């Protein structure tokens, strides 16, 4: 029996595992690909126009970095080449001593072993991952696959220059960096399990499936029962389907929070996601989604569970917007985390968890601290009786203690308690519109704000930025200011008269950016580094009764524009239509340096330091010394500054961010002259500005920063809207002015 068992085991091993004898040479081209990603600044896009061979970009990157001496890309890699590579990487002597330094050619596996040994010393070494993956298909077998694109059990990857067609329906060991497969080991397991795929339909001999986003038909001789519209695991062995395990157990409920690790479902709490979790949208045709597409506050999908985890989700309902979920920041809008929460209600209210409910009378105070045992039971929900409003006593706003319609949810987080207000969208708008636009403005102007605010809210329902905490937006200027000012009759009238109206472009909801005051012109999204052609409804135009023909990206033209005023500009009568900040060089330098490191930490890719060779790189910077010059590198459409270079006595930095430029040049203690008086601001009102050096006795003594407008300058100027209404424009005309090509849709 023992001999028989051994024989069977050996046969099975031979069937399931095949290994090509690893005597094939490993070429410089193949090695270059791995090193380009792991040890240079190479980017995938560089392969596009670098030559007629797939390896040209990789070879160029590695050669320029001096990592390998490559005469012929097809030449074999020798042990002495990897030894020289190790010395170039400055590995410790102890590591170097373990490497061979011979002219012998390396097999693939020998190179891969050395590569992994040297990986900790490569600049992108932490991004390289070695893992096992099943190969579901390539362009040779999948119509959805693009050039050099492989669908695997670990996701979709590019595999430029690698042969994968013979690995389909097999499990292999791959080396990846980002979304690129760098290499594949020769060892192959002739068995693969495709977990949580979608079976669309079947016949007696086939099943039509969607495997991780790609359609595939598998042959299954003798299928005894039809299988359709179901989640399943499918095993393939030696090229044949050997097993189908369908999954039909489901849970449903409102989604209260979503992360990459779990979904919090009302009534079930936090349920872990399976490692191979998949989500399929079968309502809008058919599409594969990710956990980031799950919308909190709604129940649009059925969750399929097995062994205590969510394996998949099927979206089968449309999003009919009713409520929005808003994180309430603490006093001063400093943080989303609260040290404690005290609240009461104008009517009786219920405090509930998944395990218990407690009723309180109107006026009773409920208090919660992070260590309260209620939070161990999950999310705590506070629900008022009909018509009741919840007052958060532990938070102060401009109006005093704020009160809220809808329900309040309290959730534990590492840094405190998160408060979420689940409220009808139209009720939300009643406390957004007067917080964003003065209620003293004409009702027609408030209608414009109402449509913009509603559109903004609809757009953010699907963005998922706060899904981890179970919300869509927060109540600060990061989104729309909510309930900083109590609701007003004029804004309520505007909201009611535009009820359900949103702004769309080609049927898609528009991200309706707006700001306080223009300088007489708007800009587009290129100021934020976005592609302006993707947002055709954000254009640069003069916010004026008279249009001009000026190229304000030209420095001289913009200076002439910003140092003059035009009474035809709709914002001409407002304080920040024009402004000027004058500062001596010492005060300006001190203020700039005091904020520099904080700004660098918030946007390290946008604050770059000049190197000895003149190039700019992202690196820690805390002080540039005394400012010696400020140079505008680029202006966006309309003249807003996109990039400046600031030279100092100790260092030179380039700032490629509108918000960082505003923050770094603002001076809390310096008076700013405005159109109507003076003020002090921690940030520049906008980057529609020029930097004029001031000299005394031939030496730089300070700067005059002359500018106009308040805000980013994209989309609608709120103050201009009020003036347009005075000119008898209606809200529809105003929306077309600021968002050309859009349409108002009724939801």
Question: PLM ranges: what are they?
Answer:
Residues 2-22, 40-46, 66-67, 91, ...:
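Conserved, single-site charged/polar hotspot
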Residues 20-43, 51-67, 71-120:
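Short, solvent-exposed alpha-helical surface patches in non-cytosolic proteins
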